[in-house]
Amino acid sequence: MNRIREMMRDLCKPNGVCSCLSVCFGGNEESVCEYLGTIGDGIPVDSETIFDLASVTKLFLAIVYQKMVEENLVCLDEPIERYTIRFHNIANIKLKHLLSFNVQLQTDKRIDECNSRDEAIIELCDIKGSYSEKPIYSDMAALVLGELIYDISGKNFGDWVDDLFVGPYNLKTTLWRKLPKDYSRICSYDNEKWLINGVLYNKNNPVAEVNDPKSRVLGNHSEFLCGNAGLFSSINDLEVLSKALLNGSIISKKSLMAIAEGGGWENRGDQQSFGFQCYRKDVNPIQTEVPSKASKYAIASVGFTGLYWLLDIENNCYIIILANKLKDCVSKVYPNIAIEESRILFDGKQYDCSVNYVYQRDRLRDYIYDLLIM
Protein backbone atom coordinates (compact mmCIF):
# COMPACT_ATOMS: atom_id res chain seq x y z
CA MET A 1 0.00 0.00 0.00
CA ASN A 2 3.02 2.28 0.29
CA ARG A 3 3.02 2.96 -3.45
CA ILE A 4 -0.67 3.89 -3.37
CA ARG A 5 -0.07 6.35 -0.53
CA GLU A 6 2.81 7.87 -2.48
CA MET A 7 0.60 8.35 -5.52
CA MET A 8 -2.13 9.88 -3.35
CA ARG A 9 0.40 12.35 -1.92
CA ASP A 10 1.33 13.31 -5.48
CA LEU A 11 -2.32 14.15 -6.16
CA CYS A 12 -2.94 16.12 -2.96
CA LYS A 13 -1.65 19.51 -1.88
CA PRO A 14 1.07 20.66 -1.59
CA ASN A 15 2.41 18.34 -4.32
CA GLY A 16 -0.81 18.17 -6.34
CA VAL A 17 -4.07 20.10 -6.58
CA CYS A 18 -6.57 18.10 -4.51
CA SER A 19 -7.48 19.29 -1.03
CA CYS A 20 -8.54 15.76 -0.07
CA LEU A 21 -8.67 12.27 -1.51
CA SER A 22 -10.49 9.05 -0.57
CA VAL A 23 -9.70 5.77 -2.31
CA CYS A 24 -11.44 2.40 -1.99
CA PHE A 25 -11.07 -0.74 -4.09
CA GLY A 26 -11.84 -4.43 -3.89
CA GLY A 27 -14.20 -7.21 -4.88
CA ASN A 28 -17.43 -8.58 -3.45
CA GLU A 29 -16.02 -9.15 0.03
CA GLU A 30 -12.61 -7.63 0.85
CA SER A 31 -11.74 -3.99 0.29
CA VAL A 32 -8.96 -1.49 0.95
CA CYS A 33 -9.58 2.17 1.81
CA GLU A 34 -7.12 5.05 2.16
CA TYR A 35 -7.67 8.73 3.02
CA LEU A 36 -5.58 11.88 2.71
CA GLY A 37 -6.14 15.61 3.17
CA THR A 38 -8.79 17.84 4.71
CA ILE A 39 -12.32 18.81 3.67
CA GLY A 40 -12.13 22.41 4.91
CA ASP A 41 -11.18 24.17 8.14
CA GLY A 42 -8.56 21.50 8.80
CA ILE A 43 -11.07 18.65 9.22
CA PRO A 44 -9.50 15.38 7.98
CA VAL A 45 -11.29 13.36 5.32
CA ASP A 46 -12.69 9.98 6.39
CA SER A 47 -15.03 7.20 5.26
CA GLU A 48 -18.15 9.33 5.83
CA THR A 49 -16.93 12.57 4.27
CA ILE A 50 -19.62 13.69 1.82
CA PHE A 51 -18.60 14.60 -1.74
CA ASP A 52 -20.60 16.20 -4.56
CA LEU A 53 -20.91 13.29 -7.02
CA ALA A 54 -21.53 15.65 -9.96
CA SER A 55 -21.96 13.60 -13.18
CA VAL A 56 -21.62 10.30 -11.33
CA THR A 57 -25.33 10.94 -10.75
CA LYS A 58 -25.80 9.82 -14.37
CA LEU A 59 -24.87 6.23 -13.50
CA PHE A 60 -27.58 6.18 -10.84
CA LEU A 61 -29.94 7.42 -13.56
CA ALA A 62 -29.01 4.55 -15.88
CA ILE A 63 -29.48 2.02 -13.07
CA VAL A 64 -32.95 3.40 -12.30
CA TYR A 65 -33.91 3.03 -15.97
CA GLN A 66 -32.73 -0.58 -15.97
CA LYS A 67 -34.77 -1.19 -12.82
CA MET A 68 -37.83 0.22 -14.58
CA VAL A 69 -37.13 -2.15 -17.49
CA GLU A 70 -37.00 -5.07 -15.04
CA GLU A 71 -40.34 -3.99 -13.58
CA ASN A 72 -41.90 -3.70 -17.07
CA LEU A 73 -42.53 0.00 -16.59
CA VAL A 74 -40.63 1.05 -19.68
CA CYS A 75 -39.29 -0.20 -23.00
CA LEU A 76 -36.09 1.55 -24.07
CA ASP A 77 -36.88 0.95 -27.75
CA GLU A 78 -39.94 3.17 -27.44
CA PRO A 79 -39.89 6.88 -28.36
CA ILE A 80 -40.49 9.63 -25.82
CA GLU A 81 -44.02 10.22 -27.15
CA ARG A 82 -45.02 6.78 -25.88
CA TYR A 83 -44.80 8.16 -22.33
CA THR A 84 -45.42 11.91 -22.49
CA ILE A 85 -46.40 14.78 -24.75
CA ARG A 86 -44.22 17.26 -22.86
CA PHE A 87 -41.10 16.99 -25.04
CA HIS A 88 -42.94 17.69 -28.27
CA ASN A 89 -39.92 18.68 -30.39
CA ILE A 90 -38.07 15.42 -29.72
CA ALA A 91 -41.11 13.14 -29.38
CA ASN A 92 -39.75 10.55 -31.84
CA ILE A 93 -36.37 10.09 -30.13
CA LYS A 94 -36.02 6.69 -28.48
CA LEU A 95 -35.16 6.38 -24.80
CA LYS A 96 -32.17 4.14 -25.56
CA HIS A 97 -30.66 6.86 -27.73
CA LEU A 98 -30.94 9.37 -24.90
CA LEU A 99 -29.25 6.88 -22.56
CA SER A 100 -26.42 6.15 -25.01
CA PHE A 101 -25.75 9.84 -25.87
CA ASN A 102 -26.84 9.26 -29.48
CA VAL A 103 -28.65 12.59 -29.62
CA GLN A 104 -27.80 16.19 -30.33
CA LEU A 105 -29.95 18.43 -28.13
CA GLN A 106 -30.13 22.17 -27.51
CA THR A 107 -32.41 24.56 -25.66
CA ASP A 108 -33.09 28.09 -26.90
CA LYS A 109 -31.86 29.49 -23.60
CA ARG A 110 -29.20 27.98 -21.37
CA ILE A 111 -30.75 26.14 -18.42
CA ASP A 112 -28.28 27.73 -16.01
CA GLU A 113 -29.37 31.19 -17.18
CA CYS A 114 -33.01 30.59 -16.23
CA ASN A 115 -34.31 32.45 -13.19
CA SER A 116 -36.37 29.63 -11.70
CA ARG A 117 -37.16 25.94 -11.96
CA ASP A 118 -40.45 26.77 -13.67
CA GLU A 119 -38.64 28.70 -16.39
CA ALA A 120 -36.03 25.95 -16.71
CA ILE A 121 -38.72 23.28 -17.12
CA ILE A 122 -40.34 25.30 -19.92
CA GLU A 123 -36.98 25.56 -21.70
CA LEU A 124 -36.21 21.88 -21.20
CA CYS A 125 -39.60 20.70 -22.46
CA ASP A 126 -39.13 22.88 -25.55
CA ILE A 127 -35.70 21.36 -26.24
CA LYS A 128 -34.89 20.65 -29.89
CA GLY A 129 -32.69 17.98 -31.37
CA SER A 130 -32.32 14.79 -33.32
CA TYR A 131 -30.72 11.36 -33.36
CA SER A 132 -26.94 11.30 -33.84
CA GLU A 133 -25.23 8.20 -35.21
CA LYS A 134 -22.09 9.17 -33.32
CA PRO A 135 -22.59 9.63 -29.54
CA ILE A 136 -22.01 13.11 -28.16
CA TYR A 137 -21.35 13.41 -24.43
CA SER A 138 -23.64 16.05 -22.96
CA ASP A 139 -25.71 16.78 -19.86
CA MET A 140 -28.82 17.50 -21.89
CA ALA A 141 -29.93 13.90 -22.43
CA ALA A 142 -29.60 13.22 -18.70
CA LEU A 143 -31.68 16.30 -17.89
CA VAL A 144 -34.46 15.05 -20.16
CA LEU A 145 -34.21 11.49 -18.80
CA GLY A 146 -34.33 12.75 -15.23
CA GLU A 147 -37.62 14.54 -15.87
CA LEU A 148 -39.06 11.68 -17.95
CA ILE A 149 -38.85 9.27 -15.03
CA TYR A 150 -41.92 10.87 -13.46
CA ASP A 151 -43.90 10.64 -16.72
CA ILE A 152 -43.00 6.96 -17.01
CA SER A 153 -43.45 5.80 -13.43
CA GLY A 154 -45.31 8.49 -11.49
CA LYS A 155 -42.30 8.81 -9.19
CA ASN A 156 -39.51 11.39 -9.27
CA PHE A 157 -35.87 10.45 -9.88
CA GLY A 158 -34.94 11.46 -6.33
CA ASP A 159 -37.62 9.21 -4.85
CA TRP A 160 -36.34 6.33 -6.99
CA VAL A 161 -32.84 6.90 -5.58
CA ASP A 162 -34.18 6.87 -2.03
CA ASP A 163 -36.28 3.73 -2.59
CA LEU A 164 -33.76 1.75 -4.64
CA PHE A 165 -30.47 2.68 -2.97
CA VAL A 166 -30.72 4.76 0.20
CA GLY A 167 -33.46 2.92 2.09
CA PRO A 168 -32.65 -0.74 1.34
CA TYR A 169 -28.92 -0.29 2.01
CA ASN A 170 -29.25 2.08 4.97
CA LEU A 171 -27.08 4.70 3.30
CA LYS A 172 -26.51 7.48 5.82
CA THR A 173 -24.43 9.78 3.63
CA THR A 174 -26.07 9.46 0.20
CA LEU A 175 -28.20 12.57 -0.08
CA TRP A 176 -29.79 14.94 -2.54
CA ARG A 177 -32.50 16.75 -0.64
CA LYS A 178 -31.90 16.69 3.12
CA LEU A 179 -28.28 17.71 3.39
CA PRO A 180 -27.08 17.77 7.02
CA LYS A 181 -26.99 21.04 8.89
CA ASP A 182 -23.61 19.94 10.23
CA TYR A 183 -21.55 21.05 7.24
CA SER A 184 -18.34 19.74 8.79
CA ARG A 185 -18.91 16.41 7.00
CA ILE A 186 -19.35 17.94 3.54
CA CYS A 187 -16.44 18.87 1.27
CA SER A 188 -15.94 22.56 0.70
CA TYR A 189 -15.51 23.48 -2.96
CA ASP A 190 -15.04 27.19 -2.35
CA ASN A 191 -12.57 29.45 -4.13
CA GLU A 192 -12.89 27.56 -7.41
CA LYS A 193 -11.74 29.69 -10.35
CA TRP A 194 -12.21 29.73 -14.12
CA LEU A 195 -9.79 31.48 -16.48
CA ILE A 196 -11.87 32.36 -19.54
CA ASN A 197 -10.62 34.62 -22.35
CA GLY A 198 -8.05 36.25 -20.12
CA VAL A 199 -10.44 36.94 -17.23
CA LEU A 200 -10.17 35.09 -13.90
CA TYR A 201 -13.60 34.35 -12.40
CA ASN A 202 -14.18 33.24 -8.82
CA LYS A 203 -17.05 30.73 -8.69
CA ASN A 204 -19.65 30.84 -5.94
CA ASN A 205 -19.80 27.36 -4.41
CA PRO A 206 -21.75 27.42 -1.13
CA VAL A 207 -21.22 24.36 1.08
CA ALA A 208 -23.88 21.67 0.46
CA GLU A 209 -24.96 23.32 -2.82
CA VAL A 210 -24.57 21.22 -5.96
CA ASN A 211 -21.68 22.51 -8.08
CA ASP A 212 -23.41 22.10 -11.43
CA PRO A 213 -25.27 25.35 -12.26
CA LYS A 214 -27.93 23.64 -14.40
CA SER A 215 -28.80 21.31 -11.56
CA ARG A 216 -28.97 24.22 -9.12
CA VAL A 217 -31.66 25.93 -11.18
CA LEU A 218 -33.60 22.93 -12.47
CA GLY A 219 -33.41 21.19 -9.11
CA ASN A 220 -34.53 24.36 -7.33
CA HIS A 221 -31.58 24.14 -4.93
CA SER A 222 -32.00 20.42 -4.11
CA GLU A 223 -35.80 20.33 -3.97
CA PHE A 224 -35.65 17.97 -6.97
CA LEU A 225 -32.88 15.64 -8.15
CA CYS A 226 -31.73 16.23 -11.73
CA GLY A 227 -30.50 13.50 -14.04
CA ASN A 228 -27.09 15.04 -14.69
CA ALA A 229 -25.94 15.99 -11.17
CA GLY A 230 -27.18 16.61 -7.65
CA LEU A 231 -26.30 13.52 -5.63
CA PHE A 232 -23.90 13.66 -2.69
CA SER A 233 -22.30 10.59 -1.14
CA SER A 234 -19.32 9.13 0.72
CA ILE A 235 -16.80 6.42 0.01
CA ASN A 236 -18.46 4.26 2.65
CA ASP A 237 -21.81 4.31 0.85
CA LEU A 238 -20.31 3.87 -2.63
CA GLU A 239 -18.40 0.84 -1.36
CA VAL A 240 -21.70 -0.68 -0.17
CA LEU A 241 -23.34 0.07 -3.53
CA SER A 242 -20.39 -1.30 -5.51
CA LYS A 243 -20.68 -4.67 -3.78
CA ALA A 244 -24.47 -4.71 -4.11
CA LEU A 245 -24.30 -3.94 -7.83
CA LEU A 246 -21.63 -6.54 -8.52
CA ASN A 247 -23.58 -9.28 -6.75
CA GLY A 248 -26.80 -8.41 -8.57
CA SER A 249 -28.76 -7.19 -5.54
CA ILE A 250 -29.94 -3.83 -6.93
CA ILE A 251 -30.46 -4.83 -10.54
CA SER A 252 -29.54 -8.13 -12.14
CA LYS A 253 -26.07 -8.66 -13.57
CA LYS A 254 -27.74 -8.96 -16.96
CA SER A 255 -29.20 -5.47 -16.52
CA LEU A 256 -25.85 -4.09 -15.36
CA MET A 257 -24.19 -5.62 -18.41
CA ALA A 258 -26.85 -3.96 -20.56
CA ILE A 259 -25.64 -0.61 -19.21
CA ALA A 260 -22.14 -1.51 -20.41
CA GLU A 261 -23.37 -2.58 -23.84
CA GLY A 262 -25.51 0.55 -24.15
CA GLY A 263 -26.38 1.34 -27.74
CA GLY A 264 -24.06 -1.37 -29.09
CA TRP A 265 -20.36 -2.19 -28.92
CA GLU A 266 -19.57 -0.01 -31.93
CA ASN A 267 -21.11 3.07 -30.31
CA ARG A 268 -18.02 5.25 -30.09
CA GLY A 269 -17.57 9.01 -30.07
CA ASP A 270 -14.56 10.96 -31.26
CA GLN A 271 -12.45 10.08 -28.20
CA GLN A 272 -14.56 7.81 -26.00
CA SER A 273 -16.76 4.73 -26.03
CA PHE A 274 -20.07 4.93 -24.17
CA GLY A 275 -22.54 2.64 -22.48
CA PHE A 276 -25.78 3.96 -21.00
CA GLN A 277 -24.87 7.27 -19.31
CA CYS A 278 -21.36 5.99 -18.57
CA TYR A 279 -17.99 5.28 -20.14
CA ARG A 280 -16.54 1.94 -21.14
CA LYS A 281 -13.15 0.78 -22.41
CA ASP A 282 -11.88 2.59 -25.48
CA VAL A 283 -9.00 1.97 -27.88
CA ASN A 284 -7.57 5.42 -27.14
CA PRO A 285 -5.06 4.71 -24.32
CA ILE A 286 -4.90 8.35 -23.21
CA GLN A 287 -8.58 9.27 -23.27
CA THR A 288 -10.16 6.01 -22.09
CA GLU A 289 -11.87 6.25 -18.70
CA VAL A 290 -11.61 2.47 -18.22
CA PRO A 291 -8.20 0.75 -17.74
CA SER A 292 -6.92 -1.08 -20.79
CA LYS A 293 -6.71 -4.35 -18.84
CA ALA A 294 -10.33 -4.18 -17.72
CA SER A 295 -12.95 -6.52 -19.14
CA LYS A 296 -15.41 -5.74 -21.90
CA TYR A 297 -18.09 -5.35 -19.23
CA ALA A 298 -16.38 -2.63 -17.23
CA ILE A 299 -18.03 0.77 -16.83
CA ALA A 300 -16.84 4.03 -15.35
CA SER A 301 -18.55 7.20 -14.20
CA VAL A 302 -16.69 10.47 -13.71
CA GLY A 303 -17.61 13.68 -11.89
CA PHE A 304 -16.23 17.17 -12.61
CA THR A 305 -15.64 17.75 -8.90
CA GLY A 306 -12.94 15.07 -8.97
CA LEU A 307 -14.77 11.74 -8.69
CA TYR A 308 -14.23 8.38 -10.35
CA TRP A 309 -16.20 5.13 -10.01
CA LEU A 310 -15.30 1.93 -11.86
CA LEU A 311 -17.30 -1.30 -11.84
CA ASP A 312 -15.84 -4.30 -13.68
CA ILE A 313 -18.77 -6.69 -13.86
CA GLU A 314 -16.89 -9.58 -15.44
CA ASN A 315 -13.85 -9.40 -13.15
CA ASN A 316 -16.02 -8.63 -10.11
CA CYS A 317 -14.06 -5.64 -8.83
CA TYR A 318 -14.45 -1.91 -8.29
CA ILE A 319 -12.42 1.26 -7.79
CA ILE A 320 -13.70 4.42 -6.10
CA ILE A 321 -11.63 7.62 -6.13
CA LEU A 322 -13.27 10.60 -4.46
CA ALA A 323 -11.21 13.77 -4.73
CA ASN A 324 -11.85 17.48 -4.34
CA LYS A 325 -10.11 19.09 -7.30
CA LEU A 326 -12.02 22.38 -7.18
CA LYS A 327 -11.19 24.00 -3.85
CA ASP A 328 -8.62 26.80 -4.28
CA CYS A 329 -8.02 25.71 -7.89
CA VAL A 330 -8.43 26.98 -11.43
CA SER A 331 -10.65 24.22 -12.83
CA LYS A 332 -11.34 25.58 -16.34
CA VAL A 333 -9.00 27.34 -18.76
CA TYR A 334 -10.07 28.70 -22.16
CA PRO A 335 -8.28 29.12 -24.44
CA ASN A 336 -5.59 26.73 -23.26
CA ILE A 337 -2.39 28.12 -21.80
CA ALA A 338 0.76 26.42 -20.54
CA ILE A 339 0.20 24.27 -17.44
CA GLU A 340 3.35 23.06 -15.74
CA GLU A 341 3.16 20.58 -12.86
CA SER A 342 -0.47 21.52 -12.14
CA ARG A 343 0.34 25.23 -11.89
CA ILE A 344 -0.43 28.16 -14.17
CA LEU A 345 0.96 31.67 -14.18
CA PHE A 346 -1.57 34.45 -14.69
CA ASP A 347 -1.09 38.17 -14.23
CA GLY A 348 2.17 37.58 -12.39
CA LYS A 349 0.68 35.14 -9.86
CA GLN A 350 0.84 31.35 -9.69
CA TYR A 351 -2.35 29.30 -9.24
CA ASP A 352 -3.06 25.61 -8.70
CA CYS A 353 -4.77 24.25 -11.83
CA SER A 354 -6.73 20.98 -11.93
CA VAL A 355 -7.34 20.85 -15.69
CA ASN A 356 -4.88 17.94 -16.10
CA TYR A 357 -5.85 16.20 -12.87
CA VAL A 358 -7.60 13.35 -14.70
CA TYR A 359 -4.39 12.16 -16.34
CA GLN A 360 -2.60 12.14 -12.98
CA ARG A 361 -5.55 10.30 -11.43
CA ASP A 362 -5.45 7.70 -14.19
CA ARG A 363 -1.97 6.61 -13.10
CA LEU A 364 -3.37 5.81 -9.66
CA ARG A 365 -6.42 4.12 -11.21
CA ASP A 366 -4.31 1.89 -13.45
CA TYR A 367 -1.93 0.93 -10.63
CA ILE A 368 -4.87 -0.08 -8.42
CA TYR A 369 -6.49 -2.06 -11.23
CA ASP A 370 -3.27 -3.99 -11.81
CA LEU A 371 -3.31 -4.95 -8.12
CA LEU A 372 -6.91 -6.13 -8.37
CA ILE A 373 -6.30 -8.56 -11.23
CA MET A 374 -2.96 -9.94 -10.03
Regions found by a protein language model. Give the residues of each.
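Short beta-strand segments enriched in hydrophobic/aromatic residues
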Residues: I149, L245, I313, L322-K325
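Short active-site loop at a secondary-structure junction
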Residues: K13-S22, G42-L98, K128-M140, C226-A229
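Short, P/G- and charge-enriched loop/turn segments at secondary-structure junctions
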Residues: R9-K13, I50, N220, K293-I299, ...
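Short, gly/Ser/Thr-rich active-site loops of penicillin-recognizing serine hydrolases
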Residues: N247, A260-G264, R268, V283, ...
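Short, surface-exposed beta-strand/loop micro-motifs that present aromatic residues
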Residues: A298-I299, T305-Y318
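Short, conserved catalytic-motif segment at the N-terminal edge
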Residues: N2-F51, L73, V330-E340
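Structural recognition of the beta-strand scaffold that forms the well-ordered cores
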Residues: S22, H97-L99, W309-L310, Y318-I321
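Short, surface-exposed loop or secondary-structure junction motifs
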Residues: A91-A294
